[in-house]
Amino acid sequence: MALFQKKKYIKINPNRSIIEKQAEQPEVPDELFAKCPACKHTIYQKDLGKNKVCPNCDYNFRITAKERLAIVADKDSFVEMFTGIESKNPLDFPGYPEKLAATKARTGLDEAVITGTATIKGQKTALAIMDSTFIMASMGTVVGEKLTRLFEYATTEKLPIIVFTASGGARMQEGIMSLMQMAKTSAAVKRHSNAGLFYITVLTDPTTGGVTASFASLGDIILAEPQSLIGFAGRRVIEQTVRQTLPDDFQKAEFLLNHGFVDAIVKRTELRQKLALLLELHTEVENV
């Protein structure tokens, strides 16, 4: 008989106590709290309010087009236009139709921009709002077509136009057809300008690539939300090209303001009032 015979024990599931403790903990819905990317504070969703601004550091959370519409436009004043336009997948890019269908189902949007007319404190304007939840609001043929039609409508109806930009750039799945939208939208902006009409762009986080290099930079007045990322190429691409280290705040709205690329930085909570004032100041008054 072995002197040190191995004893047999009844094993208890080591995970059982952990599972029981987890079961006793109250379930907290994921949508109840949000973590601020800037100050890292955990914030009660209700404290963010409809403007989605961090109460600790004033960081502007990214919001959807519909959320922005509710903040800016007068209630029930928005009339959507140019819906139902669809991309035909000109390059037969594999998986693109399926990606579009899935994104439409998830977001409830037809495309990465909503277009139409609205009033802001009673001032009528054409309005376009890009939505970064739709394939990062990349600009494809449909986005370009909707924006062009809106500018043409505003030109015909002699309306000012406000465009909220948010984009990762041109949509790679549509290749050269996507890049063409830069020239197409810019030409529509020029015709609107030649008619003596007013155009405001509001640059939000992020506004990059072909959108920055076209209609986003052509506003008569260019506003931006605080700390928004605004640029063309990515930071690393530029540093590797020029072989220099860029400033920490490079491509931030504040940096662009200091260098004359942005006219003003406006807090989201003050944006509606600012836009209404600008529209009022640039509205032609008859019989004066």
From Swiss-Prot:
Pathway: Lipid metabolism; malonyl-CoA biosynthesis; malonyl-CoA from acetyl-CoA: step 1/1. Residues 32-288 form the CoA carboxyltransferase N-terminal domain. GO terms for molecular function: acetyl-CoA carboxylase activity; ATP binding; carboxyl- or carbamoyltransferase activity; zinc ion binding. GO terms for cellular component: acetyl-CoA carboxylase complex. One of its GO terms (biological process) is malonyl-CoA biosynthetic process. Acetyl-CoA carboxylase is a heterohexamer composed of biotin carboxyl carrier protein (AccB), biotin carboxylase (AccC) and two subunits each of ACCase subunit alpha (AccA) and ACCase subunit beta (AccD). Keywords: ATP-binding, Cytoplasm, Fatty acid biosynthesis, Fatty acid metabolism, Lipid biosynthesis, Lipid metabolism, Metal-binding, Nucleotide-binding, Transferase, Zinc, Zinc-finger. Zn(2+) binds at C36, C39, C54, C57. It comes from the Bacteria. Belongs to the AccD/PCCB family. Component of the acetyl coenzyme A carboxylase (ACC) complex. Biotin carboxylase (BC) catalyzes the carboxylation of biotin on its carrier protein (BCCP) and then the CO(2) group is transferred by the transcarboxylase to acetyl-CoA to form malonyl-CoA. Pfam families: Carboxyl_trans (PF01039), Zn_ribbon_ACC (PF17848). A zinc finger (C4-type) spans 36-57. It is found in: Cytoplasm. InterPro entries: AcCoA_carboxyl_beta, Acetyl_CoA_COase_Trfase_b_su, ClpP/crotonase-like_dom_sf, COA_CT_N, Znf-ACC. Binds 1 zinc ion per subunit. It is an enzyme of class 2 (transferase). Its EC number is 2.1.3.15. This is Acetyl-coenzyme A carboxylase carboxyl transferase subunit beta. It catalyses: N(6)-carboxybiotinyl-L-lysyl-[protein] + acetyl-CoA = N(6)-biotinyl-L-lysyl-[protein] + malonyl-CoA. The gene is accD. The keyword Lipid metabolism applies. Its cofactor is Zn(2+).
